[in-house]
Amino acid sequence: MKVKFYAIAAFILCSDMAAPAQQSFLDGEAVFKNDEVVFHQIDEHTWVGTGNLVYNESLYLVEGTEKAVLIDAGTRIKDLDKIVATITKKPIMLVATHVHNDHTGSAVDRFPEIYINPGDKDYIPQVMPRYKGNIKFLTDGEEIDLGGRKLEVVFTPGHTPGSTTFIDKNAAYGFSGDSFGSGNLLLSMDFSTLIATCERMSTIMENYGIKFLFPGHYYGNNAETKQRVDDMITLSKDVISGKVKGEKKSNDMMGLNLVIT
């Protein structure tokens, strides 16, 4: 099945929404750096990698006592498997927040298996045409046990049908890909779906004290907060009611139907 890549319905600019000051984890000394990616440390067992091809596409290395998870693989990072092996000696499990070129680019070919949300399976032939490894499907609500550390899988459709957020309840943060926090939201589904996703995430953040969601394009100060998730609910409801209307721009719309700010 051929799927139109970037079948975007709307672009929600979220940069002006209320959010508290945040510590940047990109200011310290890099633990790894080359021309394609830079890794900085978030805490003792968590790192963020910043690619340089598509708006600072971000990948995250999350380590437990038994294994580590690599969340996303960037656009095109040569020898990514060898790079992460210089940071952790634990076996690596590759998971994807969603199947788009800047998150499941050519570096996925270096890994024997990848875990994705089945909602994005139709994107695989176009986005990962040369991947020969095993593609395994995540289950909503499952826990990935890394040994002394767990990530809960939360399906968060909106940016894509198979967008996924990974929540570390004990650390009080998560990793949301482009579902939340990337400075804007490219929405490929309807606003009712987005509202349901945001309401679910808001409840999770409230119940478990989740302070931040690290996004798929991290600039140091744009980790998503509960307040901004709630703001997205309000904005989406205003769009549905007609209180807020999108507009077409005269410049290049990059395939977008409307811009909503």
Give the ranges of each region predicted by the language model.
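Active-site HxH/HxHxD metal-binding segment of metal-dependent hydrolases
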Residues: 76-146, 238-241
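Short, hydrophobic/aromatic-rich segments at coil-to-beta transitions
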Residues: 42-48, 141, 150-152
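Metallo-beta-lactamase
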Residues: 68-70, 76, 150-157, 161-238
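Hydrophobic/aromatic beta-strand patches that form the interior of the parallel beta-sheet core
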Residues: 47, 93-95, 115, 136, ...
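C-terminal regulatory/interaction regions
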Residues: 247-261
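Bacterial Sec-dependent N-terminal signal peptides
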Residues: 1-22
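Conserved beta-strand hairpin/beta-sheet module of binuclear metal-dependent hydrolase folds
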Residues: 33-86, 165-178
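N-terminal low-complexity, Pro/Thr/Ser-rich intrinsically disordered segments
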Residues: 21-39
